[in-house]
Swiss-Prot record:
Residues 289-298 have a biased composition (Basic and acidic residues). Residues 35-70, 77-91, 427-441, 460-477 have a biased composition (Pro residues). Residues 1-150, 289-339, 421-489 are annotated as: Disordered. During assembly of the complex, component of the small nucleolar ribonucleoprotein particles containing H/ACA-type snoRNAs (H/ACA snoRNPs) which contains NOLA2/NHP2, NOLA3/NOP10, NAF1 and DKC1/NOLA4. Interacts directly with DKC1/NOLA4. Residues 317-330 have a biased composition (Basic residues). This is H/ACA ribonucleoprotein complex non-core subunit NAF1. It is found in: Cytoplasm; Nucleus. Its main location: cytoplasm. The lineage of its organism: Eukaryota, Metazoa, Chordata, Craniata, Vertebrata. Residues 478-489 have a biased composition (Polar residues).
Amino acid sequence: MEVVEAAAQLQTLKFGGSGQGSAAPQPPEDRREAPPPGVQPPPPAPSGRPPPPPAPSSDPGGRPPPPPAPNWDAGGRPPPPPAPNSDPPPGGAWVTGRNAAEPPPVLQASDSSDSDSDSETDSDSSSSSSSSSSSSSSCVSFPPVLSDGDEDFQLEKENKNFPLKTKDELLLNELPSVEELTVILPEDIALKPLGKVSSIIEQLVIIESVTNIPPVNEDTVIFKSDRQAAGKIFEIFGPVAHPFYVLRFNSSDHIESKGIKINDTMYFAPSMKDFTQYIFTEKLKQDRGSDASWKNDQEPPPEVLDFSDDEKEKEAKQRKKSQIQGRKKLKSELNESGEDFGEVHENWNAYSSSEHSKGYHHREFSRGFARGRYSRRSHGRPPPQQYYNSDHMASQESLGFTPQRQDNPVMPHYPFPPPMFDMHNFPLPPPPPPPPPPPPSMGWAAPSMASHPVLNLPYSMPPPPLPPPPPPPPPSPGENNSSHFGPYF
């Protein structure tokens, strides 16, 4: 008996050691979830390995649970070792037997407590996450998404404080304040009804005129039935036969202080020229206007306005058309006259050049003076040679000769015979041959060029040839025969 008891104690110690070893943490791949409390696990398959028992959990005091009682058979022998095809669980051996498939009740309780604690932990974590998400969602606010209708309503609400206006338009609150009228008409001045108040819009009073009365113009003073002035006409709109008049006030309270209400009859004083100004329709027909809007919805400039009367407009267009045609005709005439002037100028130059070429070939003197015009042929020797000197410029001009230009220093002094001079008693050698022709830019001057109206023209534009002048009269016997050109050398 002692041997049996010793063997039982040894087996108990072995089982306790294996239980403590199994309490060690297992790898994650070998852990299996415990069944819920109150549910028995299914029995293992005959050919498969049995499921490993769950690790025992310690109680709150940190002590391990008591080991289960060993299962002995009826003969008092220990249980046989496990089958070869079954693997022992990691961490130690486990007891097999008839009741080995059922886990110990203590271990089931510990497993259920572990699962409960895990579920509670999961629930706590989920509740904490939900609470944190709810708190974070309450802290962060997103702008609401508006539909098209909501956006239009919001824009309309914002634009109420900013009315639409053109570039240079003045709003009512931007206009100067209305002056207060304290005019009371006496009883002897007649009043005539103008119309009734049809509507009151903020600080404006609209008066609809009655028929069969002449329309009145702006700044006409309007009176109430008690003969007190209500205000001046601010604007007129509508047809000429049935216009609407607008009275402007500083505010709606100003209108109430005047005692003006809808359907009140308003009057005007037709006999008071200082308070009443009429609109003359005939004058409007003469004025030009336009209903079309211009830049920034303003009135168009005067040059693009139209007449109110069709006949006046037709006359104005015809007058404008005739002016344009007159300007075109004058321009064409000026162009034609310019072309004619150019043609005459070209013919003039061509004729002058031909005459110059003839003078070079058939005349003896390069200056172009004819011998037979101013000199008489002597029956003796030829006239002596006389050279032109710059000191006798004035004497040449007095006789009608054009002096040589002094701005050309290259020009030589050409010989020419003195007019009206008889040289019978002065025998001189014959004259030298004629010099070469002058440059093309030099013109030919006629004897009467000093008195010709085209004297101021440049030398490149010579005048046309003129008829020869009459011969000069013969000198008197008592006249001094001294030369006008100085002594001979």
